[in-house]
Amino acid sequence: MFKKVSAALLAAVVAGSALAVANAAESTGKGALDFTIDSPYKNVNWETFGQYKADFHAHSNESDGSPQPFDTVEEHYRKGYDVLALTDHNVTNTTWNRKDDPTGKGRTYLTDERYNEITNGTDRGGRGMVAIKNSDEQSKSDHLNTFFTPFNNSDGATLESNIAKCQELGGICHINHPGRYTGGKNTSGTAGEDASNNHATIQKYVDLFMKYDSCVGMEIINKLDGDSYSDRILWDNILEETMEDGRFVWGFSNDDTHSNAATGHSYNMMLMPENTATNVRAAMESGAFYASAKVAKREGYTNTNIDEINSYQPPVITNISVDDAEDTITIEGNYYNTVEWIADGEIIATGNTIDLNDYEGKINSYVRAQLKGNEGISFTQPFGVKSDIAGKANLSVDKNTVVVENDNKTVTCTVSVTNVLGANAFDAKLSYDSEVFEVAEVKALTEDTVISSDKSTDGTARMIIGTQTPVNGAADVMQVVLKVKEDAKTGITSLSLDSLNTTVSVTSDIFEGLLTVADGAKDIEVISYRELSDVNNDGEVTLKDLSLAVKNYRPENAAYDIDRSGVVDTADLIIIASYIA
């Protein structure tokens, strides 16, 4: 993967290169960088998978909600939910038809008959609603929803200790409404934004996500976007840090239901082959879902009148496709007007398709999309992005055989590049066996070379090169002439293009990285005509050796092919005869 370097460091070399890159990119349709896209939707079959509406944060009067537990379940079922986690504060939800009384408050749960009807969907066309069991909003500290985990926190618990316990027990969790604790919920001026951009705050969450992989994500929408007002800002800040190490943090949208009326406005669409608790967990872990909301205040959806928004339909995503060869992501859907693409917290593009090459310098480790419609917004999960300098490096040689008796016992090696765009600085390294070869010459082959610094050491030919004319397409970069040493042993020896580091200029940034070596290994045979002429290996060249070669005249027999031409011919016989005393 490339790294950014300061433009000032190479100012003398890169003058005019940005314009050259822009012109070349326009003509080729590709960029200076080659992207690898890691999509959380890569295993989703959009034609056969179902989309299942899920709420992972809901309350009843087991804690501070108003409905009975059975009614919270019924309301979600009535409103078309397919998945529900009942997450009362500090109460472990075991099953919706439980017979015990965990709170001692005499609460009412589903009957066994009704439980079976709802989970099997017998009165909803067979579309059952899946119960996420052993769920709990651990609330002794910053709130954390734990799933598939039979435990309840105790006094003195912290956010981290609850995450650690969840992981120890084999469950998963997500962090709830962080803006309540960070100050991100503050809507006064830039207070919420400033709180979500606070470095110490960001680092706190980054550290937790990096330490505990069972903490799969965080709420980016909670209820009608009250506490979560600035949590998308925090999410992007976290992603900037974690995605560099390949750590995805999924964004969840939940009603945090405390009343029946507050149900149905913020939810997650799980993409699964079948609606089962096992598949739900797999989707929560892999990111195979998107988050939808009718209210997202920073994005312009500010109507919180429940009577008005009850019938709203946020955008539905119907397909996401990634073309790694073209470095593109395409989204299709319904109920939307525009698709915005976000990297490092900034909207960088709009439209159904993003070509990452069009936004080089703006995309680092991730990009995500949000679909905006008249009645709400839907957020994709982040796509992981890794980038390398586009192009390939190659090694070629002028010969594959060197004769020690010849005056010209050298091999000329050429290091070249293909399909690069705007490359103007190179660091090429070629390794060889120092017991066989010595370097006779190293030189730059680039056009308008302004600097060539020989950094060769014993066994390695290396040169740093800078050119005023950036390379677009294919070019030879470095030439190395290797000479066979006088005391070199005969046999096969290998040459290797170890690396070719280069830079490209993209807008105001310079990117440095290794080109992929497409063809970088060459075997060279060092031969002695005198040794090979002794075909019977008796220590001397005599008529016997010539006789054997004559008998094998013309067949493709390497033992008698002295000059390595591919056939035994007159030239081989002449060589043998020349060594007969």
Locate predicted features:
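Append "Rare intracellular matches occur via the same short Y/T/C beta-strand/loop motifs
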Residues: 104-107, 365-372, 415, 575-576
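Sec-exported extracytoplasmic/periplasmic mature domains
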Residues: 77-82, 96, 167-168, 240-243, ...
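Surface-exposed, proline-enriched loop/turn segments that connect beta strands in immunoglobulin-like
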Residues: 395-400, 536, 562-563
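Charged catalytic cores and adjacent phosphate/nucleic-acid-binding surfaces used
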Residues: 25-54, 70-73, 144-149, 203-390
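Gram-positive cell-envelope targeting signals
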Residues: 1-26, 480, 535, 549, ...
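Acidic, low-complexity intrinsically disordered segments
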Residues: 389-531
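Alpha-helical segments with a strong preference for the paired helices of cellulosomal dockerin domains
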Residues: 498, 535-557, 565-581
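A metal-dependent hydrolase metal-coordination microenvironment
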Residues: 29-193, 223-234, 254-257, 279, ...
